[in-house]
Structure formats: structure tokens, C-alpha cells
Curated annotation (Swiss-Prot):
It comes from Chlorobium limicola (strain DSM 245 / NBRC 103803 / 6330). One of its GO terms (biological process) is tRNA modification. It comes from the Bacteria. This is tRNA dimethylallyltransferase. GO terms for molecular function: ATP binding; tRNA dimethylallyltransferase activity. Its cofactor is Mg(2+). Monomer.
Length: 316
């Protein structure tokens, strides 16, 4: 794309879960007459509604959203797929003389779109099998501690209980002799003019919002939604490569259905695991992306962000 074609900046609003990204994006999209690109790896699935905190039907009618309800559980859609498709849609939005606002918190979706994925090596089955056997024998904590020593930045972005990315990170180190973090430093320069704003929110306030959101999800029917998924997609739950059903909020309820925990404990774990996820998101954003952090709340939040990051004339 030539510089002459890059007429419009692309505003990117990111932040931890429950930080108010979607509401702010709706406000800004209204000011810009923009379309929203959802960078959320769960909202793209039709079946994951309450637990993924999708925009309301009213919001979807008022502002055009991309990558909401476009896939069904079981359809593969990687971060690379998202980056390629989102890039093409942003170009289309610009060609229609409109703005695009990217909003979300899925770290790999955002990094793929904003920076492009580098040339990571293909998998090595022998190495992967050995690491998987070591995981089964020694447990994930030992492997996670190894990664923390070799690549602390990558380790800080991972959930120690989710082992697929842990094994892949160690596999890449063995294949290349380099860490994932160092390999990612050589990615292509983005072809679009991204203006990245992160929503800053005090940790106690964020955690309070997370607890409130979980309670509201339960009251809105999360248990029933999870039970439907559990019954209809039971076989997929046993598939290691299907990560959509391993989402926080659903996985804990699946354990409740299987009598591995009681209901109150499941809800407590949803809140705890969501807080852990928010912490990993913040670590990722601060280590991997060039973000301008701004106050998430207040009546002037939307115009302040427009003025500072994107479209000063539209903030007046």
C-alpha cells in the first residue's frame, strides 16, 4: 500500500477483560461513523455468547461489527487467519471512506494484526513427543520453570495450566536455539497506521468489575449456555486442539457438571481465573506492543482518546 492510500489511521483500543473496551469503542465508533473490528478469539463463535461478553444486539444493529458470530465451534480460525482477514477488511472499510476501530483483548489476534507473525519454524514431532512425555512424567511446573529461565517475557504471557503453548515455546527454543521473544523482534513493519491505545484502570477497580461481570453472566444464563455446550459438543471437549471450549467461564462449569467441584467453588474459580487472565493480558501488552495508556473512564474518555491518538478534528 502506498503512503497516498494510507489516508486514515486505524484506532486500536485494547485492555484487560472487563476494562470497558466495548462500550468505549461504541462511543468512539459513533463519533467517527466507524466500523468495529473485534479482536476477540471467543466472540467470533456463534455458540459463545454470554461467556464471551459479546456486544448486545442493539450495539450490533447500531454499529457494524466484524468477526462477531462468524464461526461455529469446531471451525478452525487461527490468529494468522484473523490477521489476514482483518487486514483485508480494514482496507475495504477505508475504500468505503470510513474509519475502522479495532477493539479486543485477545493477545495473539492483536499481535498478529499489528505486527505480523514472524517466521517461526514448523513443528518437530520428535521434540514435541519428548516434551509431552516429560510433561506427563514431571508435570507442567517443571517445564514452565524452564521456560521462565530461558524466555521470561514469553513465560509471563502464558497460563501455566494450558500446556500447548508452553510445549510449543520450548520446542521453538530447541529447534532454533532462539527464544520466541527474540524471533518476534524481527517481524515486518505494519502496513497500516495503527494508533494503539490501552485502557488504564486501577487493579482493585478492575478486579471489582470482573467479579461484578461474572455475577451478571451467571444471572444472565451462563450456566445454561455452558450446559448446552457441554451436552452438544462433549466430544470436542476431549480434543486437545479445540481451545474455544477451554475458555475461562465455561471450563470451570464443565468441571461442575462432571462433579469435580461444587457450584460456588466453580464461580469463585471463574473470578480468580479471569483476574489471572487480565494480569497476563496486561503483561503481554506492556512487553510486546507500543501502547499509549489512557484513563478508561470519565465523560471525556472518548474525545481524549480521539484527540491524543487518532482524529483530533473529530474530537471537538
Amino acid at each position: 500500500m502506498t503512503s497516498g492510500e494510507r489516508q486514515k489511521p486505524v484506532l486500536v483500543i485494547l485492555g484487560p477483560t472487563a476494562s470497558g473496551k466495548s462500550a468505549l469503542a461504541m462511543n468512539i465508533a459513533g463519533n467517527l461513523d466507524a466500523e468495529i473490528i473485534s479482536a476477540d478469539s471467543r466472540q467470533i463463535y456463534r455458540e459463545l455468547t454470554i461467556g464471551s461478553a459479546k456486544p448486545s444486539e442493539d450495539d450490533l444493529r447500531m454499529v457494524r461489527h466484524h468477526f462477531i458470530n462468524e464461526k461455529t465451534i469446531g471451525e478452525p480460525f487461527t490468529a494468522g487467519d484473523f490477521a489476514e482477514a482483518a487486514y483485508a477488511r480494514i482496507l475495504d472499510i477505508h475504500n468505503r471512506n470510513k474509519y475502522a476501530v479495532v477493539v479486543g483483548g485477545s493477545t495473539l489476534y492483536l499481535e498478529g494484526l499489528l505486527k505480523g507473525f514472524g517466521d517461526l519454524p514448523p513443528g518437530d514431532q520428535e521434540i514435541r513427543s519428548r516434551l509431552t512425555a516429560e510433561l506427563a512424567l514431571a508435570g507442567g511446573e517443571k517445564l514452565f520453570e524452564r521456560l521462565r529461565k530461558l524466555d521470561p517475557i514469553q513465560a509471563a504471557t502464558l497460563d501455566p495450566t494450558k500446556t500447548r503453548r508452553l510445549i510449543r515455546s520450548l520446542e521453538i527454543i530447541e529447534i532454533t536455539g532462539k527464544t520466541v521473544t527474540s524471533l518476534q523482534e524481527y517481524r515486518r513493519i505494519p502496513a497500516l497506521d495503527y494508533r494503539i491505545v490501552g485502557l488504564s484502570i486501577a487493579r482493585p477497580i478492575l478486579y471489582g468489575r470482573i467479579d461484578t461481570r461474572v455475577d451478571e453472566m451467571i444471572a444472565s444464563g451462563l450456566v445454561e449456555e455452558a450446559e448446552y455446550l457441554y451436552k452438544k459438543h462433549y466430544s470436542l471437549l476431549r480434543t486437545e486442539r479445540n481451545s474455544a471450549l477451554k475458555t475461562v467461564g465455561y471450563q470451570e462449569l464443565f468441571d461442575f457438571f462432571e462433579k469435580k467441584t461444587d457450584f460456588d467453588r466453580a464461580v469463585t474459580l471463574i473470578k480468580q481465573h479471569t483476574r489471572n487472565y487480565a494480569k497476563r493480558q496486561l503483561t503481554f501488552f506492556k512487553n510486546r506492543l507500543n501502547v499509549t495508556w489512557m484513563d478508561a473512564f470519565g465523560e471525556h474518555a472518548a474525545p481524549d482518546i480521539l484527540r491524543a491518538a487518532c482524529c483530533r478534528e473529530l474530537a471537538e
